[in-house]
Amino acid sequence: MTYNPRDHYFRKAKQENFAARSVFKLEEIDQKFKMFKPGQVVLDLGASPGSWSQYASKMAGEKGRVLGVDLSPVTVKLKNAVFIQADLRDLNLEDIFKEHGFVPPFDIVMSDMAPKTTGIRMTDQARSMELCELALDVARRFLKKDGHFVCKLFHSDDFGKLRDEMKKTFAKVEAVKPDSTRKISKEIFLVGLSKK
């Protein structure tokens, strides 16, 4: 099967006015685990181009809020969302929350962060793992009790270690490869449900 950048999910995203096809990965995960509810406050790490924030914004509704952080700009406009263009590692999150009127803890912390790929599998996997560990650290600090966490990473030999690490923080941890993920992709999503 050849790679088609304009596949069914790409076209569907355009038809439904989502910034990217990745929205359907999050939607599938949510349909499986029922994480999103009206009125939630959501932290979106690696928010660009904005499709995960669009989904979270829609599900959280007018009483909910979304804070997105990414190195790249997010151009979608959402009434209940704020976007910060910065490297997460350089931010004092407490200051950012205060500046934009967010009061942790968050109901959901989600990360679609991905490293700039080098084409060297082990390097890309290690960088992806580092980003997921960074997101997990943020979730441990700012996610409410019983809150949920979703993180994308490239599958590697260290995958099991990260899953075990998440089990210390969450009542249930699941690994998911949504149908909307390209077949050739090494992406997998770790879902942490009900923070202890």
UniProtKB/Swiss-Prot annotation:
It catalyses: uridine(2552) in 23S rRNA + S-adenosyl-L-methionine = 2'-O-methyluridine(2552) in 23S rRNA + S-adenosyl-L-homocysteine + H(+). The keyword rRNA processing applies. CDD domains: AdoMet_MTases. Pfam families: FtsJ. It is found in: Cytoplasm. Its main location: cytoplasm. Gene3D superfamilies: Vaccinia Virus protein VP39 (3.40.50.150). It is an enzyme of class 2 (transferase). GO terms for molecular function: rRNA (uridine-2'-O-)-methyltransferase activity. SUPFAM superfamilies: S-adenosyl-L-methionine-dependent methyltransferases. This is Ribosomal RNA large subunit methyltransferase E. The gene is rlmE.
